[in-house]
Amino acid sequence: MSTSLGSNTYNRQNWEDADFPILCQTCLGENPYIRMTKEKYGKECKICARPFTVFRWCPGVRMRFKKTEVCQTCSKLKNVCQTCLLDLEYGLPIQVRDAGLSLKDEMPKSDVNKEYYTQNMEREIANSDGTRPVGALGKATSTSDMLLKLARTTPYYKRNRPHICSFWVKGECKRGEECPYRHEKPTDPDDPLADQDIKDRYYGINDPVADKLLKRASTMPRLDPPDDKTITTLYVGGLGDTITESDLRNHFYQFGEIRTITVVQRQQCAFIQFATRQAAEVAAEKSFNKLIVNGRRLNVKWGRSQAARGKEKDKEGTTESGIKLEPVPGLPGALPPPPAAEEEASANYFNLPPSGPPAVVNIALPPPPGIAPPPPPGFGPHMFHAMGPPPPFMRAPGPIHYPSQDPQRMGAHAGKHSSP
């Protein structure tokens, strides 16, 4: 009993007729006003080979036209989009989702068994409320931390871009900016992502995109608790303007008693202090790389104690050998610190040995009598800037040191070794 479009068969009651497709937000596009064409029994499903209603639309400006590739029955069996065949809940390939939920694909692949299985699944779908998937996926009740970490919560509209213009690659395209295809260099043909098959993606086998995501999941960073057992505070970043203290409390109260929640709206972050260390560790483990509040993915880290921050502040301007260096005098406050000072705050700038003499303090001398004092910092040319230390309100964010301040630099003791 065949149900394909090309065969002259009596069993046309199994052909699918739908009023609206099952699509993900990415394939539907960012434009809320789209024009969609509907072709009844337009093509055969690429999985079950049954005729179904084909929908075609343009998801946005300078995007390629998209259409449904599989029927709605095959889409409901796997809970995937009819166009991209990605999971509707997580936005991931079927192979990644089944690996995270420990599901095993049991769909038949031969024609006769496939038709019999499809008819049974259609009967099960008709008896359900339509809000939950059927089959093995509908019976899976456990959630996976890996899926929550890899899930794509926001649409990725770059996936709807046009294909690469083959004439432009050969240097023969004469349309210029009017060409509806992309004028970009194609990817490496040896790249596994360049060869994808829609049936392999549906059945969850040999999917290069899924293999890439599974490798990324195996190398994901972990949030280890600090050695200081007194730290019970978590840092939550990326709040935005919509997430409030009550939203954070509604999520974190399940892990234990919360002592305080401090929201820093200017920095779009919050500090959540728990009453016990055990509650903080459970909250960090359950929320790291998988915390989503009001549709926003939040960054969770461990807070730092006041003692640790005080030690870091004391180390500013001190070399690894313990030599205290004075800040460079005469720099106006408008100058930002050099990038190297920000990135390598604890580096040894001067290559000092482990033991060295204390630094020499440079004392600025007052100007000779009869000479007007130099203008204040920020006025006049740089050569006339004051050499003394600027006022406290004009200092740079951190102390800055030059290699010439190092007493062990090359040439500092040249006079001692010179011949008389």
Swiss-Prot record:
GO BP annotation list: cellular response to xenobiotic stimulus; mRNA cis splicing, via spliceosome; positive regulation of RNA splicing
User: What Gene Ontology molecular function terms does this protein carry?
Assistant: pre-mRNA binding; U6 snRNA binding; zinc ion binding
**Ranges of residues in domain RRM:** 232-305
**Keywords, A to Z?**
Cytoplasm, Metal-binding, mRNA processing, mRNA splicing, Nucleus, RNA-binding, Spliceosome, Zinc, Zinc-finger
Extract the CDD domains matched here: RRM_RBM22
Chain intervals annotated as zinc finger (C3H1-type):
159-186
| PROSITE patterns xrefs | RRM, ZF_C3H1
PANTHER family assigned: PRE-MRNA-SPLICING FACTOR RBM22 (PTHR14089:SF6)
Q: What name appears for this protein in its UniProt entry?
A: Pre-mRNA-splicing factor RBM22
Phylogenetic placement of the source organism: Eukaryota, Metazoa, Chordata, Craniata, Vertebrata
